[in-house]
Every structure is written in structure tokens, then in C-alpha cells.
A protein has these predicted regions:
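Heptad-repeat register of long alpha-helical coiled-coils used for dimerization/oligomerization
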Residues: 352, 376, 403-406
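Charged, amphipathic alpha-helical segments characteristic of ABC-type P-loop ATPases involved
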Residues: 383-481
Length: 481
């Protein structure tokens, strides 16, 4: 049994919490009470920022964190159980690896001290999966939601509802993709054949880490499950009843007034049933939610259809297990912000087919490449303080934004006039270049600059900007909260 009184070591001399006999018994009982689990689920037991892993989970944790299983210890007298323990810093790295690279599900149990004569215990506090990371996003990406690893990626959770068609081999599919970190929903109703080329193209386009499928013995669902697995995506079965459609009232409550929900509310919309499944999985109460989502179109008809094998053979993106591997994305990714990284990723996943759109995009790229002065000004000055607006917008929409988030937006908005002037002064000699810049950037930036005038005034009269310079984000004295 582990030492009952002394602080021990794990891995490379890492100090771990002392284990007494009472805590050992509590841990072993918690492991037993947690019951059976799948091989794709990792259970973690936390007390005072120390994290315990048992049996096969301990093998995996020790191998990743310490490079071998030599760090494993055992606890228990009658039936010794192998375990591994680590501090928060190592847990943070391991959690990213488990969810973002290995696509495991994670359950975290929190220690509860006994009160009023009750015995201490462990209680399930967090259940996360690759497509449901909102509860631990601050660990994966940092408190600001803009950590380097993964911040430039979308994190869509996808659900698929399927009905076999009348023609042999034809399928009717409804797909819903939700990214709660961006408050974005994308839906599609499509017809596909038994080889599922249209579905695979959309999955490549979205790049989800997890897909929800109805729990059924249907041959069609089995084929979709095989496709999901082949593309290294975690497939999760959910009860078929969760795929029942949302009501029109629920849809209107869920989406912003700018979202066109006319197709979604149709009675024959399979994507509405898929969206219902995602909402239930993410615990989004569609009857009472105050968070407003943005509905975006999802289609593969205007872009080249790519398969997972094509993306891999062309080495478009680095392997999740080897992020430093050279790839097309890593060569091209000289973006200044996480939002820019997401846009580049989307461009690579969805090559255009329309010649007019291709020409416009190439004109933009050529303008940036040939105009060195403008490119350097944008990179070194105007875009330097730009935060991840999409994630911040979602935080404001969910009433989770802090004073620091407000200040980040304020600083970025203050740079808009200079950014607009830079684009206007360096639009090139050709008229087409000016029109392209106007339509793609300048008009929208001018509109945003005007819209944020009152926001700037509010920040200047509400935040104590002198304290902000010292790193303290506070309301001005005399102002109400």
C-alpha cells in the first residue's frame, strides 16, 4: 500500500500528496463505485490539485507524462491496484493530449470532505469528450481562450440523423454541427449514396473530433460509423429518441434574429432532429437558453469534395500525434491571429470551384504579396493587438465575458481607424484591387468602427484605465456594477 504519512515522488522527482489509509480507502471505493467503462474513457480522481489514475488509465497517463510505466505505484492490501498521480501542470498537458489528440472521453471525479459525520467521497464533476469541452476549455486553451494549441481550430460537435431512401443504396441525411466556443451552428439536409461521398466531404470540411449517431442496428448507421472511424473521429451512440425535432419556439429562442431558420423549421428537416441531439448532449436547454447562436450555411456544392485519405496523402495538415510535422498548413500559416488560422484552415479544407471567386481570392493574395509595405504594417502594427473576436463574441453572447475581455475589444477597436487608412492608402494601382479591398475589408471595417463608438465611450467612462495599466481590471470608483 502507498505510504500513509510521507509525501512521495512520481516521475522525475515530482512531489506528490501524502496518502493516508483513509484516503486510500476512499479512492479505492470511488474507483469501484464508478463501475465499468469503455476503453475510450479515462477516469481521473482529483484532490487538492493532485490527479490520480488507476489500472489501464494509469498505464496510459504514466507512459505519456513520464515516458514509462516505472512511475506506477500500487495501493490496497487485499487486491493491490496500480495507480499514477501527477500535479496540475502535468495533468494539463495530459488532458490536452487525451481530448485533442487521442480523442478519448474523460470523467473527472472531485474529492468531497466528510462533513457532519459523513464519510469523505469522490463525486463526478466533469464529463468531457472531444466534442464537448466547454467545462474544461479554460484548461485546454488558457483562461483567455486564446492559448496557442488549438485556439485557431474550430471545435464542432456533429450529429447525424439518417433515413434510408426509397431507391436502393440512397440515404437521406440530416447533419447539425455546433461549436459552443464560437456560438456557431451549421446544418445541412442532403441525399447521399451508399459510399457516402457527400457526407465525407462535409466531415472533412468541418473537421469534428466527435460525431453523435443514433443507437440502432441500422445498416446505414453502421456504414456511417465506419466512415467516422476511418477518418479518426470519435463516434458516440445516443438514444434514438434524442433525435426528435426541436419545436419552432425552441429554434427561435436559440438563434439570433439575423439567422435564417426557415429551412430548419420545416417538418421534414432531418437536420433539426440532429440539432436536438447535439443540444441534449451539450446540456443546452432549448426552452430557456439565453445564449444566441448564429446559423451558418453548410454545403459542399460550391467547393471541391475532399476525402480524408486525400487530405492525408496531400499532407494538408500535420498529424495530431505529430504537430511539428511539415504540412501545407504549417508552410502557409503566417497568420497573426487565431481567427486568421481558422480561416486559412477553412480555405484549405474547401478549395473553390467558381472561377470568379477563385480570381477574387487570388487578387487579394497577390495584393498582399506584392505590397510589402502594407503587409509589414498590418503584421507589425495594426493586427498585433487583435484578439480572437469570434471566441470573445461568444463569451459576450453567453454573459461570460470579463472586464479584461471588454478591454481587449476596446484596444482592438481603437486600432480600426489606422487599419482602414492602411488599406485605403495601399490599395494598388489597379481599380480591381481597390474594389476587392472595399468589398472584402474596408466597408465592413468602417461599419464596425462606427458601431463600436458607443462601446468605446462606455469603456472609457466605466473602466478605471489607470488601474488597467497596472494589470488590474476594475470599475471606476463611484460607478455601479
Amino acid at each position: 500500500m502507498a505510504s500513509p504519512s510521507k509525501t512521495g515522488e512520481c516521475g522525475d522527482g515530482e512531489e506528490i500528496e501524502a496518502l493516508d489509509s483513509v484516503h486510500v480507502d476512499t479512492l479505492l471505493k470511488a474507483v469501484e463505485n464508478a463501475g465499468q467503462k469503455s476503453g475510450c474513457t479515462i477516469r481521473i480522481f482529483e484532490k487538492n490539485d493532485f490527479y490520480y489514475f488507476f489500472q489501464s488509465d494509469a498505464d496510459l497517463a504514466a507512459s505519456f507524462t513520464y515516458g514509462s510505466t516505472a512511475a506506477l505505484k500500487t495501493m490496497g492490501k487485499k487486491t493491490p491496484v496500480s495507480f499514477c498521480v501527477m500535479n496540475y501542470s502535468n495533468f494539463e498537458s495530459l488532458l490536452r493530449h487525451l481530448l485533442l489528440v487521442r480523442a478519448f472521453r474523460v470523467e473527472i471525479f472531485k474529492f468531497l470532505a466528510g462533513k457532519g459525520g459523513s464519510v469523505p467521497s469522490y463525486q463526478l464533476e466533469v464529463r468531457a469528450s472531444p466534442g464537448n469541452i466547454s467545462a474544461i476549455e479554460h484548461i485546454l486553451y488558457g483562461e483567455g481562450g486564446e492559448g496557442e494549441q488549438g485556439a485557431s481550430e474550430s471545435n464542432f460537435l456533429v450529429a447525424i440523423k439518417v433515413i434510408p431512401g426509397t431507391d436502393s443504396g440512397q440515404l437521406s441525411l440530416g447533419l447539425a454541427a455546433v461549436d459552443v466556443s464560437l456560438n456557431v451552428v451549421r446544418v445541412a439536409d442532403l441525399q447521399d449514396n451508399q459510399h457516402l461521398p457527400a457526407l465525407e466531404a462535409i466531415l472533412v470540411q468541418l473537421g469534428p473530433r466527435e460525431v453523435l449517431l443514433p443507437q440502432t442496428e441500422s445498416a446505414a448507421v453502421k456504414k456511417i460509423s465506419e466512415l467516422v472511424s476511418r477518418n479518426k473521429i470519435l463516434g458516440t451512440e445516443r438514444p434514438s429518441k434524442e433525435f426528435s425535432s426541436l419545436s419552432e419556439t425552441e429554434i427561435n429562442r436559440m438563434f439570433s434574429s439575423k439567422s435564417n431558420t426557415s429551412e430548419l423549421v420545416k417538418s421534414d428537416s432531418l437536420s433539426c432532429g440532429a440539432l436536438s441531439s447535439v443540444c441534449k448532449f451539450l446540456n443546452i436547454d432549448t426552452a430557456t437558453t439565453s445564449t444566441k447562436f448564429y446559423l451558418e450555411p453548410l454545403s459542399s456544392s460550391t467547393t471541391m469534395r475532399l476525402t480524408g485519405r486525400t487530405m492525408k496523402s496531400l499532407n494538408v495538415f500535420p498529424s495530431p500525434t505529430n504537430p511539428n510535422q511539415p504540412s501545407i498548413f504549417s508552410i502557409l500559416n503566417q497568420t497573426r491571429s487565431p481567427g486568421g488560422g481558422r480561416l486559412l484552415s477553412q480555405w484549405l479544407k474547401t478549395p473553390l470551384l467558381d472561377s470568379v471567386m477563385i480570381k477574387e481570392r487570388l487578387n487579394l493574395v497577390e495584393l498582399m504579396v506584392t505590397n510589402t509595405e502594407m503587409r509589414q504594417l498590418l503584421w507589425e502594427d495594426h493586427l498585433r493587438k487583435f484578439p480572437d473576436f469570434q471566441r470573445l463574441s461568444a463569451k459576450f453572447g453567453s454573459s461570460k465575458a470579463t472586464l479584461q475581455d471588454m478591454y481587449k475589444v476596446y484596444v482592438a477597436v481603437a486600432k480600426l481607424e489606422g487599419l482602414i487608412s492602411c488599406l485605403q492608402d495601399h490599395n494598388g494601382e489597379e481599380a480591381d484591387n481597390f474594389v476587392t479591398l472595399q468589398d472584402n475589408f474596408i466597408k465592413d471595417l468602417q461599419e464596425a468602427n462606427k458601431d463600436f463608438e458607443k462601446f468605446q465611450q462606455m469603456v472609457e467612462t466605466t473602466l478605471d484605465l489607470k488601474q488597467v495599466e497596472q494589470g488590474h481590471f476594475m470599475i471606476r470608483p463611484g460607478r455601479s456594477q
